[in-house]
Amino acid sequence: MVLGPVPSSSADAGWWTPTARPQPDSDINVTGEPFKGTDAQGRVRGFVDAHDHIMSNEGFGGRLICGKPFSEAGVADALKDCPEHYPDGSLAVFDMITKGGDGKHDPVGWPTFKDWPAHDSLTHQQNYYAWIERAWRGGERVLVNDLVTNGVICSVYFFKDRGCDEMSAIRLEAQKTYDMQAYIDKMYGGPGKGWFRIVTDSAQAREVVKQGKLAVVLGVETSEPFGCKQILDVAQCSRADVDRGLDELYKLGVRSMFLCHKFDNALCGVRFDEGALGTAINVGQFLSTGTFWQTEKCTGPQHDNPIGLAPAPQAQKELPAGVSVPSYAADAQCNARGLTDLGAYAVRGMMKRNMMLEVDHMGVKAAGQAFDILESESYPGVISSHSWMDLGWTERLYKLGGFAAQYMNGSEGFTSEAARTKALRDKYGVGYGYGTDMNGVGGWPGPRGANTPNPVRYPFRTADGGSVVDRQTTGARTWDLNTDGAAHVGMVPDWIEDIRQVGGQGVVDDLMRGAESYLHTWGATESHRAGVNLASGAAASASSTEWWNPFVDYAPGKAVDGDTATRWASEWSDDQWVQVDLGSAHTVRRVTLDWEAAYGKAYRVEVSTDGSDWQTVSSTTTGDGGVDTVRFAAAPARYVRVHGVQRGSQWGYSLRELGVYGG
């Protein structure tokens, strides 16, 4: 990219320049006006960071991530290490666990920053507000701030200054995000005037981006949302807890969330971590729930990460005497725990509230079951934000209208993966995103070296061409991506330029379309309305009903009562059916079947206008349970029948809900 004249400092005395920035403070090292408006087609432009953790220093007991993203007392107070890291890092236990070695480092942050932040330091603040400002000035226009904590890690970590209740941490992180918005607003003259704008709907976000500012979306990534842990496979929460929790999060401004993260909970099973970290998490799983991860052979091409088997001595010594981490069969790489009934209820609860579901961290069994539910309603609100979803689900996600972002990998790896999925993005007309996962204990791109043949050459122009970026300086420290790697979130513009150097302008162009694609998914999620279920409350009949349990009613009407906690169940033989009378003839195109464990492997969907002459509109011999969505050419029907041909289990057939739709 040919570099033209660098804008003068006087050119920066515009709306984007604060009038009351605290002094001293970090430099931004970007000059020029941030781009505004839309393209010729009315689409917003800009990058989307779909996965960041601005406030994770407030989670995990308050002492896992050291330093704060802002402080009313100034930068020296914000960017200082945890007390136990002084004088030389000898007690930086989490550094030892995540980075290896003895954890020793220079704890001094401001103003020297000798050892942190760094691309391989996982326990120090990377989201100082001025560094986020630099990412915005470099072209980022949407940022998802995932409120995050983990009660298990908090409970076993040696240092903490608060309790470990996850929902308390989530509430605090949400409040701190609003506080940071107010902190930035003060620099620009008052409420609403700053560049950091928390948004609660896609229309607000579009307006913010059109103004050239940063739209901040609140998400949640926690291991036991709403208190939904499991102990010995017994859920510690109820449907009422899920509803109360979702309502509270929505009121806080949260619009996307994960249902499970790192540890199996009462909602779903997770995608495993590998290596020593996986072993440590598996130990934590046992200490929290009384159960280790359980694996099974994968039933499809998707699979979970290989389960962590490497030693993790610091964690393993916490196990009770006589208890050890189990070994796992090499051909069993999938989490046996899928989406629980309570988890399915939570997915539907998010759909009811028009929230976006994050499927990263779900095991493939749970993710597949979640996709089944989303597809039953053609629900577009599904996000993969940082490469933790099996890539075999990507087209399924795009078909629904969802959005995918890649983890902030090194430029070479990032561009290679971007190229691999390019054809899919073009097929569905979508842009691309990245998930920095800063403050997320993940690790970030290291330096490619000053002598690499295609380094970042400072200063350089931003992707839109309107601003100029130089090396970033905070206090006495200056970072260069070529020699330091991505030490903090302010290095995102440098990393984007590195991607351009390695992968070409096309990758950057796809990333510039990311904000539009993310907001399109969000807008479609907000406008989604559940179809009218013609079978709801309709008269139902069946070939038989399971009768030998005198305490539970399995009548056919239970399949159309709108309650997934009830079900119809047949006697235990293959040739069985259940049907509904819609009351009058309708044009139908879709039937949904929410199977209990007793599912149909082979079955037909039949329709009739008179209850005597039946037409088969769809059939299968490969049913696998879960939620089936059966689509077929429009057909007139007053009666709709599901006719079982072959059972998928030793029991009969059992449907929680049978839905019939006109579209």
Which role does the model predict for each range below?
Residues 643-650:
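Short beta-strand-plus-loop segments that form exposed binding edges in beta-rich domains
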Residues 1-9:
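Secretory targeting and sorting signals
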Residues 578-587, 632-636:
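Extracellular and analogous surface-interaction loops
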Residues 10-334, 341-348, 365-375, 382, ...:
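N-terminal hydrophobic targeting/anchoring segments and the immediately downstream early-domain regions
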Residues 615-633:
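Extracellular carbohydrate recognition and processing domains
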Residues 531-583, 594-599, 619-623, 650, ...:
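Disordered, acidic Ser/Thr/Pro-rich linker "stalks" and the adjacent N-terminal cap
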Residues 586-597, 642:
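A short beta-strand element within beta-rich, extracytoplasmic domains
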